Every structure is written in C-alpha cells, then in structure tokens.
C-alpha cells in the first residue's frame, strides 16, 4: 500500500557542497506548553537534488521519500525563490 499524503516542507538551502545532495534548514514556530510563548525551532535535513539546480540561499520545497542513503529521506520538488 502506497501512502498518498507525503509530508512536504519548505525551507532554505544552507549547503550544496555534496554531490546531488543539499542541506535544508526548516524553521517552525511551536508554542511552549507552559508559558504559551511561540519559539522558533529549526532542524536541518539532507535532501536529494538529482539535477543539482538549487544553490545556497534558495527557498525550496521538499517531499518525504523512501530512504535514499543513511541520512537522506527527502527529495527536492521545486525551487520557490532563487537567491539574487
């Protein structure tokens, strides 16, 4: 059974030094359970970039895929904004 609704995330490319791999930083806002204050929580994930089209600073959309390597479980869907 294939899962239809795959997770999609939007983030900023922080590294493109690896071959066909980019590192994307995801920033989310989460509310503290006791103080009810919003905090910025960030995480970095490695994503597969088959055509190597994204560069550092680009805003990209990534999607969850099957494991490609030890660390890669995401793939680039599209580049939303290019860095000027």
From Swiss-Prot:
It comes from the Bacteria. It holds the Pfam family Ribosomal_S17. Part of the 30S ribosomal subunit. Belongs to the universal ribosomal protein uS17 family. GO terms for cellular component: cytosolic small ribosomal subunit. One of its GO terms (molecular function) is rRNA binding. Disulfide bonds: none annotated. This is Small ribosomal subunit protein uS17. SUPFAM superfamilies: Nucleic acid-binding proteins. PROSITE patterns: RIBOSOMAL_S17. GO terms for biological process: translation. One of the primary rRNA binding proteins, it binds specifically to the 5'-end of 16S ribosomal RNA. Keywords: Ribonucleoprotein, Ribosomal protein, RNA-binding, rRNA-binding.
